[in-house]
């Protein structure tokens, strides 16, 4: 079954909602953005997450020192890196790694040392999907996440189109820039059961 990552969480209530609804991954954004949290804030929230739900830290062009500090302070299970990636960034990290790839029309998939790839829209966090026809995932060495403009209305189609390891959502479960607990529940319900979640 396709796994679900709920990203950009910053409150106790949102974390608890995502966990209880069945999220497999919880994402904390450490890069500058409206969803950014500090290492200290994430460490507090991480204590609410059971061991079978994986904690992901999201970074843009980080140094290896930054990654190691966050892994240690927050207890991250994975790091997700956007932007520039040094050749040795993922070598011998104490946790798994995800390299984000912006799908911009050239169809290029990098030769990455990361454990997973994540395919995102050209502007991450914009709520806009990329053109799914521009991405060919045939023969990929790594399992991959699909992100970029996913929501409860299109996520089932995305899963049918790509058969990804996991799907990733942030703005698609927000209302007025804040995490919407009902949207989180409905999104996960659609992925896990292919239905709207309304009873």
Swiss-Prot record:
User: According to its UniProt record, which reaction does this protein catalyse?
Assistant: N-(5-phospho-beta-D-ribosyl)anthranilate = 1-(2-carboxyphenylamino)-1-deoxy-D-ribulose 5-phosphate
Q: Which Pfam families match?
A: PRAI (PF00697)
> EC number(s) on record?
5.3.1.24
In terms of SUPFAM superfamilies, this protein maps to: Ribulose-phoshate binding barrel
PANTHER family from the UniProt entry? N-(5'-PHOSPHORIBOSYL)ANTHRANILATE ISOMERASE
How would you classify this enzyme at the top EC level? isomerase
Which Gene Ontology BP terms does the record give? L-tryptophan biosynthetic process
Gene Ontology molecular-function annotations: phosphoribosylanthranilate isomerase activity
The annotated pathway is:
Amino-acid biosynthesis; L-tryptophan biosynthesis; L-tryptophan from chorismate: step 3/5
Query: What is this protein identified as?
Result: N-(5'-phosphoribosyl)anthranilate isomerase
Give the record's keywords alphabetically: Amino-acid biosynthesis, Aromatic amino acid biosynthesis, Isomerase, Tryptophan biosynthesis
Superkingdom, natural source: Bacteria
InterPro entries referenced in this protein's UniProt entry, alphabetically: Aldolase_TIM, PRAI_dom, RibuloseP-bd_barrel, TrpF_fam
Q: Which family does it belong to?
A: Belongs to the TrpF family.
């Amino acid at each position: 079954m396709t796994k679900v990552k709920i990203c950009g969480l910053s409150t106790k209530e949102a974390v608890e909602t995502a966990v209880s609804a069945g999220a497999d991954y919880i994402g904390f954004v450490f890069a500058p953005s409206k969803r950014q949290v500090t290492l200290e804030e994430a460490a507090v929230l991480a204590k609410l997450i059971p061991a079978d739900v994986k904690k992901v830290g999201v970074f843009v062009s980080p140094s290896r020192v930054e990654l190691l500090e966050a892994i240690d302070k927050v207890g991250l299970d994975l790091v997700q890196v956007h932007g520039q990636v040094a050749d040795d960034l993922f070598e011998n990290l104490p946790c798994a790694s995800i390299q984000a790839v912006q799908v911009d029309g050239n169809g290029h998939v990098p030769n990455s040392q990361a454990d997973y790839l994540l395919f995102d829209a050209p502007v991450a966090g914009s709520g806009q999907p990329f053109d799914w026809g521009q991405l060919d995932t045939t023969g990929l060495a790594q399992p991959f996440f699909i992100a970029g403009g996913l929501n409860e209305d299109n996520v089932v189609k995305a899963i049918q189109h790509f058969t990804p390891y996991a799907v990733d959502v942030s703005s698609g479960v927000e209302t007025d820039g804040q995490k919407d607990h009902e949207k989180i529940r409905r999104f996960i319900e659609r992925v896990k059961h292919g239905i709207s979640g309304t009873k």
